[in-house]
Amino acid sequence: MAQNNAVAGFNALNGVELSLFTTDELKAIHYATMEVLMNPGVQVSDPEARQIFKENGCEVDEKTSIVKIPEYLVRRALQLAPSRFVLWGRDKKYNTVQEAGGKVHWTCFGTGVKMCKYQDGKYVTVDSVEQDIADIAKLCDWAENIDYFSLPVSARDWAGKGAQDVHETLTPIANTAKHYHHIDPVGEHVDYYRDIVKAYYGGDEEEARKKPIFSMLLCPTSPLELSVNACQVIIRGARFGMPVNVLSMAMSGGSSPVYLAGTLVTHNAEVLSGIVLAQLTVPGAKVWYGSSTTTFDLKKGTAPVGSPELGLISAAVAKLAQFYGLPSYVAGTOSDAKIPDNQAGHEKTMTCLLPALAGANTIYGAGMLELGMTFSMEQLVIDNDIIKMVKKAMQGIPVSPETLAVESIQKVGIGNNFLALKQTRMLVDYPSSPMLIDRRMFGDWAASGSKDLAAVANEKVQDILKNHQVPPVDADILKDMQAIVDKADRAFKEG
């Protein structure tokens, strides 16, 4: 239920909070998860990961690759995992704290494979390329309500031609001063990522560990599997001091039970198994509790991300992460619409607001369309407005002697207005004030060209791409970073 005057995830003491579960219900999900981790357990495809589990007391069947994780190891891992860590930006003013029970932050969606391009009021979809990543990074650098950058689309122009994921590492770092979260890393290439970050710090690995400008995301395979790639991202990320996001993408009714509570059980087992592996590898490794879990539309045969179920699951995951004392990273601001239209606005607001009120530490989805397949730069700048308005709603209605304003009411008296009051003029920024969403009357809107929101957003996108300046990486350092990408490309071509 919604409660007024509760501590919100956003920086407000009198905000609105979504409680969602009782403590007993959270415990019930936890204990059900502990049963599942022992029976049937989790299939772990990576031999190195199985050995780590085995050496630390797990029952491991090498024939089936099934690992059974006892509750005491889960509890130990939760004690070791930090409840707070900092995501560093190239510019420290963009440093972002991820903290269980702390502020809510937003990042863009990832990872799509297409771009929705706006051209003279019409839309076309094309494969995403490396330049799209650079352009979106620049937009996110500008967007005041996007706190850090997540890989939004794939550099498909490099698919089969070079080390695509390594290109997807350098390009964002060079095009935004905000922290970069790689959503599609390759386990065997984590060494390249480390070397790129080290090069940024002039070869100083200790500095790179202390001030991580780069982090990674991996997904268990639902139901109840950790792939070789997922394990290697966890293991190498932990060893190199990179924050790692263990994010399940279960689908209720498909790869998890049709009941959302049951889906939370398998989701929880998948994420906790990855977090346990991280802590067994390096105690104190920085980890998120992640979710892109949604429902499976049994009638349409799709996995919608603009659904109320996604918003509820993301809110539930935020509460589970708080229960465990872990920072959370969840899907939201999501839509199944194909273009920036009415459907997109409705679905994005709904899926943004629910996890925000639950106190999720990061909500990702800005810019995303078409069930997560497509990215729109126009939608990104619209979502920047939606997020701003959700932040305002999270603040609730603070009640204090100042905000009750009895003296102002008495001063103005009956039948007058408050516009001339000094207090009103001083608080001109107090009411919500979106940048693109239009609040004018019809006549004024028509006189300015009758432009719809997507057209206005397109103009804003073009202005940002032309005029926004991103602080550059030092030329010599960038050359060293590029040399690592070139090395990865040569290794790819040599096979």
Curated annotation (Swiss-Prot):
NCBIfam families: trimeth_pyl. It comes from the Archaea. Belongs to the trimethylamine methyltransferase family. The keyword Methyltransferase applies. Keywords: Methanogenesis, Methyltransferase, Pyrrolysine, Transferase. Catalyzes the transfer of a methyl group from trimethylamine to the corrinoid cofactor of MttC. Pathway: One-carbon metabolism; methanogenesis from trimethylamine. Can form a complex with MttC. GO terms for molecular function: trimethylamine methyltransferase activity. The keyword Cell membrane does not apply. It comes from Methanosarcina mazei (strain ATCC BAA-159 / DSM 3647 / Goe1 / Go1 / JCM 11833 / OCM 88) (Methanosarcina frisia). It catalyses: Co(I)-[trimethylamine-specific corrinoid protein] + trimethylamine + H(+) = methyl-Co(III)-[trimethylamine-specific corrinoid protein] + dimethylamine. One of its GO terms (biological process) is methanogenesis. It is an enzyme of class 2 (transferase). The lineage of its organism: Archaea, Methanobacteriati, Methanobacteriota, Stenosarchaea group, Methanomicrobia. Pfam families: MTTB (PF06253). Signal peptide: none annotated. This is Trimethylamine methyltransferase MttB2. Its EC number is 2.1.1.250.
